[in-house]
Amino acid sequence: MRWWRRRRPVAGKLEGLVNFRDLGGLPADGGTVRPGLLFRSDSLAYATPADAERLVHDLGLSTVIDLRGEYEVEQLGRGPLSWAGVGYYSAPIADVSGAADLVGHYVAMLTEKGPVLARTVRHLTCAGTLPAVFHCEAGCDRTGVLAAVVLGLLGVPEEAIAADYAATAAAMPAINERVAVVVDRLGLPPRPASVPVWEPQAALMIRTLELVRERWGGMEGWAREHGLSADELSALRADLVTAA
């Protein structure tokens, strides 16, 4: 295990981020996910300067992993952390094939963007990467898939992975308001009134993980197919899992 410039936890809510949370504390194979090292979030473009100050100085944040596409980043920006001396790693997993439902969309990410996701996992094992935060726009779909990959490789039970995914539901009212603005800024067609607003439900992630087991035998099988070595997976676990 390596040592990091980890500091005290962030107390209270952040000003601009509505879907930021620590993945630490979840049950994992051989212990729990180590707190204070890996976070997920909605877009850090919404962070205020005060948020950036807290993330850097309270959490000792070292790396931002951005799952948005190049056009999103160009149009919406990176926010105040882009000039805060924090490392930046671009891992775009947008632009996957259309699917009939969200589960199909998530599986498409795992297949079509598997190499990008695998490189991102590898980057987490590099010295100096942690503590890290990863995000997309809402912090739900793309972020939820990467969270499922990492947590699955750490041996977090599927029910706990699904519960973490579903925790985004509390932030959906604020996220949906933002999405309407983002859609307009990116020149995309608005959501038709006939299309219902969805919420992340645990059952969606449970089904996704079932399909991972059916296709790859589990997340480790997915990782092997995408070039991650046993040593890299061991390093990931050594860094991110602490004995119970």
Identify the function of each model-found stretch.
Residues M1-V133, V145-A244:
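Cys-dependent protein tyrosine phosphatase-like superfamily
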Residues A138, R142-T143:
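Ser/Thr-glycine-rich phosphate-binding loops at phosphate-binding pockets of nucleotides
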